Curated annotation (Swiss-Prot):
GO MF: cellulase activity
Induction details: Levels of expression are constitutively high during infection and spore formation.
Organism (species): Pyricularia oryzae (strain 70-15 / ATCC MYA-4617 / FGSC 8958) (Rice blast fungus)
Protein name: Endoglucanase cel12A
Main location: secreted
Amino acid sequence: MKTSAALLFLVSLASAAPMTPSPAAEAAAVLEGRQIQTLCDQYGYWSGNGYYVNNNMWGKDSGSGSQCTYIDSSSANHVSWRSTWQWSGGQNNVKSYPYSGRTIQRGRTIASINSMPSVVQWNYNNGNIRANVAYDLFTSTDPNRDNTHGDYELMVWLGRYGDVQPIGSQIGNANVGGRNWQLWSGLNNGMRVYSFVTTQGAITYFNADIKQFFTYLQQSQGFPASQQYLTTFQFGTEPFTGGQTTFQVNSFGANVQ
């Protein structure tokens, strides 16, 4: 997880040379009250109003860089946040997945869910990067499984920057929700990962029922919807490499009905 919100920085005029602040310096320079909370720790976490945000630099040791995430506003209907990062090295390794998530009631199988409406608006202020922008949902036969793994993972790539690609290989094409997608499939430590990748460029405004993707997998790939419990419902970005950039989520809203 975007039209950019203006960032106000304290700029020193003592030197004529322009300086680009690191994410940590940016956090200190943002005027007090500009955001609800700043997250610069590896797994910095915030929650409120049925949503949560995680800085989630899980792969940071595969390269070098920095990242901070800022929660700008939240309500019962949405959360607004942004993440500023810069990463180098480990060309083909994901460095992080800063994300927003919807707090869900555990114990519901995919088959028992009628719909999963979600609306998101986002953008990147620098396209010269290698990263994706994607929904990420886990399911498991254990309704109480932790939210870092599952039996199945569903990713919906709304943005693809550079030569990055999903886990596995492309197994076909799909039309879901009136849009065309590449369908990829692969294994990640025993977890089956299905990725729907946009074929129409970045989708910066997306309003859809995510349940439709599970229905497609049930019908075409034999996904066991009656045996799999939903454990996460998240949206964010996976940076690989790139100079300092800001991923802005103007609004992320989701529900499980």
